[in-house]
Amino acid sequence: VSVAQDGGDSVSVAHNIDSRIVHNARMIAVGATDVLDTYLSPEKYTGIEMRYMSHTTKPTRFDRFSMVLSHQGELLKAHNRADNNDEIGGYYNFHYAWRYNWNAMGGKLHLEAGAGADVLLGFIYNLRNGNNPAQAKMSLSIVPSAAAVYNFNAWHKPFSLRYEVFVPLAG
């Protein structure tokens, strides 16, 4: 088992399974959020969110392809401008994709391109509405995706810089 730091926000763990390396990064994030759901309220709500993400990339039996699994959970609490009402919400996002892989620069640069499916389930609850206090959310999308990974060594340790893009095509 080897451990590599990706940036400063996550730790990536690689397991050697049948000489195939599985990369897994887990991240926790806390930050600001803006919520505008005009079904529940015409007001924009601002607040805080907490998010957990697990991202796994592993090779398949087919040499040039890899499989990507991403799980993401989010909880949020936000208030309106008058600060007399709150909304709470939660989301779960699952992404599954297959990508074709290219290596460049002697294996230091790794490029991936492919497509997958993205599923989102969630809710928003307005604490003060009496008639329709909640809204459920669900979506299914076909998602082309790409990634670029640059591997390097610093301070005698392996590091990876990874950039990914997902663009909903249909759904």
Region locations from a protein language model:
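Outer-membrane beta-barrel transmembrane domain signature
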Residues: N131-G171
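Transmembrane beta-strands of outer-membrane beta-barrel pores
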Residues: V30-L36, H71-H79, A117-Y125, Y150-F152, ...
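Residues on the lipid-exposed face of transmembrane beta-strands in outer-membrane beta-barrel proteins
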Residues: M50-T60, Y92-W102, A115-V119, P144-Y150, ...
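Short loop/turn motifs that connect adjacent beta-strands in outer-membrane beta-barrel proteins
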Residues: N16-V22, T57-M67, N101-L111, N153-L161
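Short glycine/proline- and aromatic-enriched beta-strand/turn motifs that initiate or cap beta-hairpins
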Residues: A4-A78
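Residues that define the transmembrane beta-barrel architecture of outer-membrane proteins
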Residues: K44-Y52, D86-F94, L109, A134-P144
